[in-house]
C-alpha cells in the first residue's frame, strides 16, 4: 500500500474541465502506462461517472437556450448592401454573371463565417454554462457548424448537383425559416425531400450501369502468362505511404525484385504486408505488379492478375464473379455517400487568396512597366505582375518596401495614397491538391429580345467552322438592342415584290464604340482579312464584324471595303444622278486580262465619295513579285495623289498609304533577297563576301540566289541582304564608277580597262561598294523593267451599251505605283508584292442647274429576280441644298418609298423620280426583313416609335398637342428618305423645336456634326444623315398597323445640350452603359445606343449590355435577332469544388461516362503527341507507333483510375484500385475500325474488342487500322458480346430488332443472360467440380480415378521442380489435375 501511495505521489493532480482532445491525450497516456485492459476498466468508470453526473445535473435543452448573436442584424444588412451594389454593377455591365455569382457567394460566406466565429465568445460572455455551449464545445453532441445553423445563420446551400445556390438562407433555425428558405434548404439536407428522391436513385442507377458493364467477368484461369505489368515506384513523392500500401497489398508481382544481387521477391508471388514494408524500407527499384489491365484473357480474368480476394486474404478462387463485386464496390459507397451531405455549403472558400496589406499610411510607388491591367476574378480592375515586384510605400518618416510575388494582383494604382492595413495586393493561392478545381460552363441567356451587337472583333472558333460560335479575344460588351419582332407568313408577300430593292444584311455605318470608361476604342480597326482562308487547322480565322462588316450572302463575299470573288465583271447601269454597278460572276465572258485577278471595290467607311476618289481597284498579276527589292523610277516626274480632303476621309482607316501616279510609262524593280533574323542568331557568311545559290546562311535558312552579301545590324535584329549581279573592278579611266546607285539604259557603252566596249542588252543598276582595307569595286545588278500600259480601256470593263449613254458620272482608269522611289520593299516569305494597282476613279459633271454636287453616296443593293441574286453598288449623287417646301424632291428616290396610293408608278428600282405629297404620318415603325429562323414565316424586326419618350425643353401638354396637330399637317421640315443602307445627306437648315423628331420618327437622323463656337446665333446647323436604322424597309400597305409592336419601349429621348462642356463626346452609334455621366445634370438613366444627335437632345435606342471576358464564346451572328431566353454567351470558368460527394457522384459519373468538360480526350491527345515524339527519339520510327499506341492506352487507363480514386479518397472512402481497374478495362477495351487501310473483315466505324482486332490482324497477316476509343459505361453496356444482356439493360426493342436482323448469336457466357433465360449461372467456386461430377456420373470407369490419385502425388513433386517443367508442360495441366482430384474427393 505504501508503495502505491508513493507512486501516486509522483503523479500530478489535475483539476480542470476536460474536452475531447484532452480526453484523447489522457487515454493514450493511460494505454502507454497501464496497457489496454487496465485502461478500458478506467474508462468504464469514467463513463459511469459521467452518466451519473449528467443525470444529477439533468442537462436539458430548451428553445430559450439558443441565444442568437446580437451583431447578426447589422452583419446581414451590410452583406445585403454589398450584394445590392454588386447587382447594380452587373446591371450596368461592369461585372458579368460568373463574377457576380462568385463575389456574392464570397460576401455571404464571409458573413456566415464571421458569425460563426462570434458565436463562441458570445456564449462564453453571456452564459458559459449554457447547455448548448457545454454540449457542442465539449464535443459531446453537435459540432460548431450545427450550432451555428441553430443560432447564427444557415448560410449558403448547394443544390442536388452540388452547384451553389446564390440565395443565402439568412435566418437560423431558432428564428424559423420562410417557405422559400425551407425549400432551398431541402436540397442540401440529408433527410430533405429532394435528397431521398433524387440522390439515392442516382447512386443506384450508377451501380446498375457499372454492374451491367462487368457482369460477365469471372475468374476462369490460374495464370494467363502475361509478362506485362504496371510499375509502382515507392520513391515517388506524389504517392503517400498509405496509398502505396493500399495499391500493393494483395497484388501479384509481375517480375522478380532484386535488392542488389539478391532476389527478395519472385515473379507471381502475392504481396503481403511484410513484403510491402520491406519495399518501403529498402525503397528499391520500381515494383512491377500485375493488374486486370495486363491480363491476356479476353472476356474473363485470371487469378494472378486479380490478386488476393478481398474477403479471405488468399488468392481469389476460380469461378469467383469478380466483375459484379467490382461494380458493387464502386457503386455502393455512392449510396452511402449521399448520406454524408450535411454541410454548410460547398462554397468557393474564402481562403483562395491571401492579401498583402499596407504596413503604414503613405504613397505607394511601383514600376508601371512591369505590370499590366487585368480583371480580378470578381471583375475589379487590377494590375497583374509577371515577375517579382517591389513596391515602396513612402510615409512621412519611413519608407517601407514590400515584395509582391509573381502572378499576383495589385489592387492600387501608382502614386495612390494608401492607409495602414489597406489591402494592396492579392496573392494567388498555390493550387493545392486539396481543393479540387473544376472547369464549369455557365450559359448566359438574354433577358429581352432584340438585335445583337458586339464591340470588338471576334475570332471564329476553329472547331465550329460551320456554326456561329465566336471566341472573344478581349474583354468587351455584348449589346442586345431592343426591338420587337413579329413573325408572319402573310404580310411579307405584300412587302417584297420582284425587283424591289432589298439590302444585304446591313452595312453598319461607321461606329465608334465606347467601353464603360468612355474610352473610344479606335484601336478596334485592323487590317482587313478575307474571311475564307482556312489555313492550318486550329488557326483562328478573324471574323470582323464589329466595325468593318463582313457580308456573306451565299455566293458573294463582301468585306467592307469589299473584296469580290474572282472572275467578276463590272457592269454599270447608270441613270441620271444614280449609278449602279452590278457584279456578275459570269464565267462565259472571260476576259484574258480580268480573268484571274480580283476586283476590289473600295468604299470609304462612311460611304461618301468625293471627286476623284477611287471606287475600285484590281491588282494586275503582271506586276506581282515574290521577292523583296527596290522600286526606282529615276527622274521620272511623279505626283502623289493624296489631297487634303482625302486625308479627312481616310482618318479612320489605319492602312492608308500614299499612291503615286505615273506620268511616264516605265519603272524598274531591282530584286534582292532579304533575310530578317533575330539579333541572337549565328550567321554563317561574312559581310561583303560572295556566295553561290543555296548556301547556308544560318542554321535553318539557305540563300535562294547567289551574289554579294551585306549584313546590317539594327537594334534587335539583323538584316541580311543578298544581291545578285556581276562585280567589276574599275580602272582609273572608268567614269561610271564614281556614281553610286544609278540606272544605265541599254545601248550605252560600258568602259572597262581590259575589255573592249560592249553594248548593254538590258537596263542595269550600278552600285559602288567599298569594303574595309580593300579596293572598292562596282557591283552591277540586273533590273526588271516594267512598262505600264496606259490604263485598260473602259470598254473592256463595261458592256458597250452602257457606256454610250450620256451620263454625268465618269469613270477613269488610272494606274498607281504603290511604293515610293528608292523605297526598299520587304516581302514576308511566301507573299506576293503588288507593285502597281489599277484603280477606277470616279468623277462626275456639274449639275444642270449649276448647283455643284460635292459628294456621292455608295450603298450596296441586292436585287433578286426569280432565283438570281444580283448585287449592285449604288451611288447617290447629293446636291448641297434642298428647297424646303412641303413637297419633297427626291432625285435619288427609290422604289419602296411609301406614297399612300398617290402615285404608284415608281416601282422600277433603277429609275424613279417620285413626288410625294403626304407626310409620313402612317408609318410609325421601321421594318427590316431578317434571316429567317424557320423558312415558312418571314420575320420582321420592328422598331416601334409610338411610345418614344423625350427629355426635352418643351412641357408635356404643349408637346402632346403640337405633335398631334403637326402629324395631321405636313411636316414642317423637308425630309428625304433613301433606302441605301448608307443613306443620303440632306442639309436641315432650320430647327423649329425638338418635337419635330416625332414626326419623322421612323427615321434616324445621324449627325456628322461640327461643333460651332457661336452655336446660339447660327441657325444653319449641322449636316445630317437621314437614314433608316440599318437600312429599314417601309411597309407600303395601309393595313400595316398589324405589324407594330408598340409595347417595347425602344427609343427614348434625352435632353442634352451641345453648348455645355461635356465629359464625354457623343458620337453616333455610340453605346452607353447605364449611369454614365453624359451631361452636367447627372448620370443618365438607361443604357442604349445613340441614334440621333440634335442640338439639344439625343435619341437613344435602349439596349442591354452583357459583359464578356476573353475566352468566352459568343453564340449568334452580329446583328442577328435573339429572342428572350436564347443563349448569348458561354463562360468557362474554374471554381474550387467543395469536397462534398454531392459533387463527387456527378464527377465520378462524368469520368465513367467520359463526358467531362475538362475533356479527358484533349489531355490524352496532347499526351499521345508528347509520347510519340519522345519514343521516336529513343527507338526510331517503325517501333514508335506500336509502342506509342500501347503506352497511350495504358496511360489513359491509369489516369482514369486516378481520377475516380481522387473523388472517393476525398470522401475518406477506400476502394481497392483493382475494382476500378476492372471497370476501366471494360470501357477502354474497344477500338474503332478506321477507314484507311481497310481489311475485308470489319466495316469502318465498327466497334470491336482490342484483343480481337489484334488476333485478326495476326491471322490475316495484314494491318488493320483502328484507334482506341473511350466508351462511357452506358455505351459499353450496349456494346457487349451478348444481346440478351444489352436488351435487359436499356432500349429493349431496338436491341432485339437489330440482333434479329443481324442474326446475332448469344453464347450465354455472362451471368445476366443465363439469369434471364433461367439457366444456371456459370460462376461460383464449386462450379467446375459440379461440371466434372456430372461427367463422371455418366461413363467414367474407376481405373481413371486411381490414375487421379497418382496424379495428385505427381502434382506435389511437380511443385518443387516447377521451373524445369514449365516449358514443356501445357499451362492447364495443374488445373485439370486439381479438378479431377476434387471430383474424386466428393465421390
UniProtKB/Swiss-Prot annotation:
Q: Which reaction does it catalyse?
A: RNA(n) + a ribonucleoside 5'-triphosphate = RNA(n+1) + diphosphate
Q: Residues annotated as region Disordered?
A: 883-903
Name the Gene3D superfamilies on file: 1.10.132.30, 1.10.150.390, 1.10.1790.20, RNA polymerase Rpb1, domain 3
The answer to whether UniProt assigns keyword Chloroplast to this entry is yes
Superkingdom, according to UniProt? Eukaryota
Pfam families from the entry?
RNA_pol_Rpb1_4 (PF05000), RNA_pol_Rpb1_5 (PF04998)
Sections of the chain in a coiled coil: none
The cofactor required is: Zn(2+)
InterPro entries xref list: DNA-dir_RpoC2_beta_pp (IPR012756), RNA_pol_beta''_euk (IPR050254), RNA_pol_Rpb1_3_sf (IPR042102), RNA_pol_Rpb1_4 (IPR007083), RNA_pol_Rpb1_5 (IPR007081), Rpb1_funnel_sf (IPR038120)
Question: Which molecular-function annotations from GO does this UniProt entry contain?
Answer: DNA binding; DNA-directed RNA polymerase activity; zinc ion binding
GO terms in the biological process aspect are: DNA-templated transcription
Location comes to:
Plastid, Chloroplast
Q: What is its EC number?
A: 2.7.7.6
Q: What's an example GO cellular component term for this entry?
A: mitochondrion
UniProt remark on cofactor binding:
Binds 1 Zn(2+) ion per subunit.
Q: How does it assemble?
A: In plastids the minimal PEP RNA polymerase catalytic core is composed of four subunits: alpha, beta, beta', and beta''. When a (nuclear-encoded) sigma factor is associated with the core the holoenzyme is formed, which can initiate transcription.
Q: Which HAMAP family match?
A: RNApol_bact_RpoC2
**Family per similarity comment:** Belongs to the RNA polymerase beta' chain family. RpoC2 subfamily.
Q: What is this protein called?
A: DNA-directed RNA polymerase subunit beta''
Q: Which organism encodes this protein?
A: Platanus occidentalis (Sycamore)
